[in-house]
Amino acid sequence: MNKKLLVTCFEPFNQKKVNSSFVAVEKLADKIGDYNLTKLTVPVVYGKAFETVHLKIEELKPDVILCVGQAGGRKNVTLEKIAINYRSATICDNEGNKYDGIKIDENGDDGIFVNLEVEKLAEISGCEVSLSAGSFVCNDLIYMIRNYYQDKVQAGFIHVPYLPEQTKGDSASLSLEEIVLKLTLIIENL
């Protein structure tokens, strides 16, 4: 039976021309395992990222949502275990918003675990588990999805490293082929 998978990625941000999450998600096949993929690029803007994804969720009614974002400095693809109710970053989003330690939802839980088996998926795919999606727009998106939808839909977040062409010297990066392979393995084993 074919299932619906919504896979999101982000536009470039912080005055960069490339976002590795966008490049990798665009390279994914349209059908992987039991899943028909719908790909969606979202803005790197607090709140608007969720608004964009929320509209697509309501239209598509996916079985699973996988959000993919870029995390410079990481050497491997990482599955995020928890989203935190916190906005704080040293850089602005793509509309110039910058927060220094505020809650996403004043009445929300401090943290919400994703409802995917991240340890199992990491082991199968050769990825790592991370306990922090940060406090920028990536975390904002997965927190808002989990807070709004609770367990009505499975949702998780995956951070991918920079691509080699985004780095200088021996900075952490991973090839596009390796990132796409790991994302594919994760999807095949959802």
What are these regions (language model features)?
Residues 1-135, 146-151, 171-177, 187-190:
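N-terminal catalytic or cofactor-binding beta/alpha core of small enzyme domains
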Residues 167, 179-180:
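Mixed-charge interfacial surface used for oligomerization/domain docking
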Residues 137-139:
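Active-site glycine-rich loop that binds ribose-phosphate moieties when present
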Residues 123, 145, 153-166, 184-188:
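C-terminal folded domains that constitute the principal catalytic or ligand-binding module
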